[in-house]
Amino acid sequence: LRLISMNIYQIFTRLYGNPKHNNVPNGTYAENGCAKFNYFTDERLNRIRKFGFSHVWFTGVIEHATQTDYSAQGIAVDHPWVVKGKAGSPYAIKDYFDVDPDLAESVPHRMDEFEALVCRVHKAGLKFILDFVPNHVARQYASDVAPEGQRDLGADDDSEMA
């Protein structure tokens, strides 16, 4: 029996490589910035590999509730009373079929940018782990990119019941 050694490097994706270092408490996206999928360059990923890591565990990739307004891109606005801080919790999933628009250079092409990241990770000889918790969702869960025929979580719930 041969055991395989795994060394996992966990990244809170929105912080890695963020050029804004002076965070404003309860600051907005414009004030505090956000890392992007494209910040994970071949050079940076190869450096992670050279440190001896075999896997990269990306946290906060799936679209979650936020106070950043992406309604111009067809993404529903979240009510601020149910969002944790301005950036939101990466575990308040808003759409399991989409990625966080904050992490994209171009919001309409966010999935292409994410898929390119996965390819870069594999090209660097690393495995990609996507962090998610299957039973944690935002209060206003609603997919805007779900496959045809896929019902949203809670769509058939009886709203008259507690």
Where would I find each of the regions flagged by the language model?
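N-terminal structural segment of carbohydrate-active enzymes
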Residues: 1-127, 135-161
